[in-house]
Amino acid sequence: MYNFSAGPACLPEEVLIRARDEMLDWHGSGMSVMEMPFTSDEYRQIESHASRTLRNLVDLPDNYHILFLQGGAYAHFAILAMNLGGNHGAADYVQTGHWSTRAINEAGKIIRVNIAAGSEDSGFDHIPAYSEWNLDPEAAYCHITTNETASGLQYHWLPDTGAVPL
């Protein structure tokens, strides 16, 4: 069975067996990865390998850093507002469903949110046409949820927000 949903998916049995076998003793270290101090040589090797692999996979230039962060979507919504909000008065958000609403609610704890466009009144059944958006040219940033997995909406284009970061 193949699962292409946004949540957890099935893994090949070989992967599950390897994970099981290495759960209690990572490569002879005597401990699980979950028990390792993030400052240990073993953990740093794992992180370095993961970073190199990801960098090669997406062809990421060396002038970009890779951060491995915990917290899930809600934490990232807050991190975005905290880091890009700066001294700006507001950020633009386009509300198209479950995840954009969660992003708006989380960012609203940190920065004033301008809902530049949305489709809540029609049950989140479409992405508003760009001509309907009310963008603030002074906004700290503009946030869109490119793939609303809960409602099945997906952008097939990216808006031109001018000098405002998207």
Feature-to-residue mapping (PLM):
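Active-site phosphate-binding strand-loop segment of PLP-dependent enzymes
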Residues: 7, 107, 119-166
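Short, well-ordered alpha-helical microsegments
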Residues: 12, 76-78, 100-101, 150-152
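Conserved PLP-anchoring active-site segment centered on the Schiff-base-forming lysine
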Residues: 85-101
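A glycine-rich helix N-cap at a beta->alpha junction
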Residues: 111-119
